[in-house]
């Protein structure tokens, strides 16, 4: 989608020219799943699917929003005096939340805005359309009002919006990947300290294929918060003998030595996943750096097995995609990505085998699940930016 198309659509809706045009990516996580709220490492990257926006500042305090993805909702209007969550405002709540927290933290958003958005992240796919939107609104406000805010601080406001405004108890990974992404690089992020480094993603003759189950996931209504609470309870049990705040502080051996403190089998499985997945993530980044793509692929597979059996967040749709992908020629690794319970998986596939891969996996999935999956080639993109 180019800049002119976005600007023309803005003018058609609002009758004025936009001041600036923006793009905010979605994200995939290569490995390190359900570790972000457990103080572990994650290894995400921004992708070329995302959310486009155009905006102008107003002279009054009205906020007017229009999404080409929800045309039937028309222009949704609110104001700077009414930044409260309201179910009928639908997707605009994410925007209201970002503006609310910018103002709360002392940033001078003193006029209204007209904002047009159009995204090409499939809805409910688990590719972080909400973080994409949050960071888009943050960068729009930063640009229009010339706000002096560090990008990592903007990322934190995105997480606050998700946690405190929308009511989803998620970690910081999605907003960090979306806001801090770099073309052709993944981010190794320690969610405990927010220390991060970029790692070039050189897949050789392979591409990353995103596999969409086409089963929507509803994060707020899923078992996400339940998993988080199971892990927090496990930390409490381990604290009887260990001076830790999060599972991410433990290596696998220390965890195994003290696992007897966790009294419930399910909690033990959840905690084991968080600890071992954190180790796998660091090993995967090292393997990628060394060019050992086969080892990287095996770690990706191991991640899915752990998410399926220990964390139990996959479900028949994601398992069918991953298990079928593993059997295909030219596949180095495959796993679910994102929170799970539907959404997407990723597979690392030889470029020359992609068409056969899509056909074979699509056929098995459709026969078993009753409807077709969708496939996209992931291009690793820059974080949220002015176009």
From Swiss-Prot:
Pathway: Carbohydrate metabolism; galactose metabolism. Substrate binds at residues 33-36, 224. Keywords: ATP-binding, Carbohydrate metabolism, Cytoplasm, Galactose metabolism, Kinase, Magnesium, Metal-binding, Nucleotide-binding, Transferase. Mg(2+) binds at residues 130, 162. InterPro entries: Galactokinase, Galactokinase_bac, Galactokinase_CS, GalKase_N, GHMP_kinase_C_dom, GHMP_kinase_C_sf, GHMP_kinase_N_dom, GHMP_knse_ATP-bd_CS. The record marks 27 as: Transition state stabilizer. This is Galactokinase. The lineage of its organism: Bacteria, Bacillati, Bacillota, Bacilli, Lactobacillales.
